[in-house]
UniProtKB/Swiss-Prot annotation:
Cross-referenced PANTHER family: IMIDAZOLE GLYCEROL PHOSPHATE SYNTHASE SUBUNIT HISH (PTHR42701:SF1)
Name by which UniProt lists this protein: Imidazole glycerol phosphate synthase subunit HisH
Domain of life, source organism: Bacteria
Taxonomic lineage from the root: Bacteria, Bacillati, Bacillota, Bacilli, Bacillales
One cellular-component annotation, GO: cytoplasm
Keywords on record: Amino-acid biosynthesis, Cytoplasm, Glutamine amidotransferase, Histidine biosynthesis, Hydrolase, Lyase
């Protein structure tokens, strides 16, 4: 069973629908016991970094998620991916979950923001749907795929059991479903493979 973390911020219905379309058993919850019982966790997110971190703190999820990320497959999507890192410079400096070393920084001012629309992944070679103005800056060894948008933007990162997708797989049609399926089949079944 996959649990989608419900902390009041995120595009939950679409990611739930996408995972169910792949035949997954899915629950949407903020209940720590149910989240702890899940085989894998998905942290969605839409909006701004600081309010999202505040919601995670209000719901008592920060330490729990930090611990769970060392025990089971954990997927952060869009803002959910950004929250995995140590901090963001959005609206000042905001501390993140710190599950992945690295920061989240505003994309260059010489490109149109937000970065919205379809963009081809360098390694997978297929287009996925993005909506964001900030991107991760992290160890290149963890970047599974990327796009070029004013700078190198990590589109998929993976370290141990933790995976982040900056784009919205649930809004990326068949390609998004394929990438979610790859995450489920590889990351959830083996800590040694990457998507």
């Amino acid at each position: 069973m996959i649990a989608i973390v419900d902390y009041g911020v995120g595009n939950i219905a679409n990611i739930e629908r996408a995972l169910k379309e792949l035949g997954e058993a899915v629950i949407v919850t903020s209940d720590l016991e149910l989240l702890g019982q899940a085989e894998a966790l998905v942290l969605p997110g839409v909006g701004a970094y600081a309010p999202a971190m505040a919601r995670l703190e209000e719901t008592g999820l920060i330490e729990f998620l930090q611990e769970q990320a060392t025990k089971k497959p954990f997927l952060g999507i869009c803002l959910g991916m950004q929250l995995l890192f140590e901090s963001s410079d959005e609206d000042g400096q905001t501390e993140g979950l710190g599950i992945l070393p690295g920061t989240v920084e505003k994309l260059p001012s010489d490109v149109r923001l937000p970065h919205m629309g379809w963009h081809q992944l360098k390694n997978h070679g297929e287009a996925v749907y993005f909506v964001h103005s900030y991107g991760a800056v992290c160890d290149p060894d963890w970047i599974v795929d990327s796009v070029e948008y004013g700078r190198l933007v990590p589109a998929i990162v993976q370290k141990d059991l933790v995976t982040g997708m900056q784009f919205h797989p649930e809004k990326s049609g068949e390609v998004g479903l394929k990438l979610l399926k790859e995450w489920r089949e590889t990351t959830c079944n083996s800590t040694q493979q990457s998507i």
